[in-house]
């Protein structure tokens, strides 16, 4: 009998997950287009989060970009909620195990678009075993200029990502 190995339990892959994209490809394309063009693309795409609330990415990004702040320059952050506290879900684990570069590219594109210099990945406590591989991925991205100061060789852009490990409790949504 043939042995079948399950890697991530995705039965149907969309266009993003079905193709291999080199690390940084989406980030370089987003930087080349610029923040306003990226917002326009998000509006047309009608891309929505995977959390179930149905909020469009455009509304989240536009709100963050236009938000006022008492501090100058304004501090903006990109938060990726990988807590996955909903019963029976494993989308975050799959994405971070098999497609971490796409997640980090997406966070970086969001950062450039909204004017953030810091991203925070909130990782579910039960997924602590993913932490070493994710940290190595972030270090590789820094060595390759895909995170940190002078993002993608641009002295005027900076973006970095930190990982914060949760304690195993459901916290909140993205908004």
Label every model-predicted segment.
Residues 1-175:
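Feature of Fe-S/electron-transfer and energy-metabolism proteins
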């Amino acid at each position: 009998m043939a042995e079948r190995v399950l890697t991530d339990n995705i039965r149907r892959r969309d266009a993003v997950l079905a193709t291999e994209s080199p690390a940084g490809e989406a980030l370089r394309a987003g930087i080349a287009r610029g923040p306003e063009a990226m917002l326009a693309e998000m509006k047309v795409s009608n891309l929505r989060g995977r959390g179930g609330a149905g909020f469009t990415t455009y509304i989240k990004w536009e709100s963050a970009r236009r938000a006022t702040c008492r501090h100058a320059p304004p501090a903006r952050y990109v938060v990726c909620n990988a807590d996955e506290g909903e019963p029976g879900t494993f989308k975050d684990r799959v994405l971070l195990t098999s497609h971490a570069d796409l997640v980090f590219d997406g966070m970086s594109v969001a950062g450039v678009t909204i004017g953030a210099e810091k991203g925070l990945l909130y990782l579910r406590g039960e997924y602590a075993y993913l932490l070493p591989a994710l940290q190595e991925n972030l270090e590789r991205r820094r060595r390759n200029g895909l995170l940190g100061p002078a993002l993608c060789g641009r002295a005027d852009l900076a973006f970095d990502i930190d990982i914060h490990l949760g304690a195993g409790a459901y916290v909140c949504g993205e908004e």
